[in-house]
Amino acid sequence: MLTTLLQSDLPGLPLRHCGKVRDVFDIPHKRLPVDTRSGEYLLIVATDRLSAFDVVLPDPIPGKGEILCQISNFWFQKTEHLMPNHLTGINVASVLPDGIDKTLYTQRAVVTKKLKPVRIEAIARGYLIGSGWKDYQRTGKVSGIQLPDGLQEAEKLPDPIFTPSTKAAVGHHDENIDFDTTVKMVGAELAERVRDATLRIYHFAAKYAAECGILLADTKFEFGTDIDGRLYVMDEMLTPDSSRYWPIDEYQVGTSPPSYDKQFVRNYLETLDWDKTAPGPTLPQDIIDRTRAKYTKALQQLAGINID
């Protein structure tokens, strides 16, 4: 049975960060298994909050956090041969405080390594859509990458491209940046490692998704490093929050395809008289229900997991 969680409440676990969707807690050593107490770990909780245009909307999508967590875990396991990830395998229930309803958290939270975040959003695009399409219409480029003339909306790119952005605070907008700016922000060696990992994972995931009847139009990754400089993929992976998923049988060049992601909510919000700043508008129940159905469909079609 899916649960609903808008805000985490975990007495005894210090709240480290409250993001648009995820709440991140430090885990005191006394709550960790004895053989892991030499390390530093976090509890990351995927709530049912929904953000659009970098604004957290007031209405939760019931069960969304559980769906996101299960999709992420599926992809983390599927891609661990390509790139190490932040998961530890430590049982979530074992680190939760006593006296709470642990069933609210066990399917929507993970225990992870504590890493130093790379200060960019790592985006891979295989199709020309969204802000990439807008950039192309204006300049013929996306994040400084020159593309062929005459491409249409939603058209497949000759090759997937790496188009990073800044990591804005909650309520502020991410900004697309070119690779030279990325190098200035994080250094040449790390920028190249992040770019290579982003495109490597995208190629693998796009091929797998296509075999499931889904096009992976674009996706966003976050990376972090440990004290030895080893690079990990972290946060979430290939979820409907961080990716555009299109059903293959409804894909058509020249128009924005229907999707299994929150683009559906963005499209609804575009019809409103809203300036894309907080507070966000209330969502009708029909939009909430249809959004949940899209996320559920993505989980079932990609991972073969039925959830209700």
Swiss-Prot record:
InterPro entries: SAICAR_synt/ADE2_N, SAICAR_synth, SAICAR_synthetase_CS. GO terms for molecular function: ATP binding; phosphoribosylaminoimidazolesuccinocarboxamide synthase activity. Its EC number is 6.3.2.6. Pfam families: SAICAR_synt (PF01259). Keywords: ATP-binding, Ligase, Nucleotide-binding, Purine biosynthesis. This is Phosphoribosylaminoimidazole-succinocarboxamide synthase. Belongs to the SAICAR synthetase family. One of its GO terms (cellular component) is cytoplasm. The keyword Aminoacyl-tRNA synthetase does not apply. GO terms for biological process: 'de novo' IMP biosynthetic process. It catalyses: 5-amino-1-(5-phospho-D-ribosyl)imidazole-4-carboxylate + L-aspartate + ATP = (2S)-2-[5-amino-1-(5-phospho-beta-D-ribosyl)imidazole-4-carboxamido]succinate + ADP + phosphate + 2 H(+). CDD domains: SAICAR_synt_Sc. NCBIfam families: PRK13961.1, purC. It comes from the Bacteria. Pathway: Purine metabolism; IMP biosynthesis via de novo pathway; 5-amino-1-(5-phospho-D-ribosyl)imidazole-4-carboxamide from 5-amino-1-(5-phospho-D-ribosyl)imidazole-4-carboxylate: step 1/2. It comes from Xylella fastidiosa (strain 9a5c).
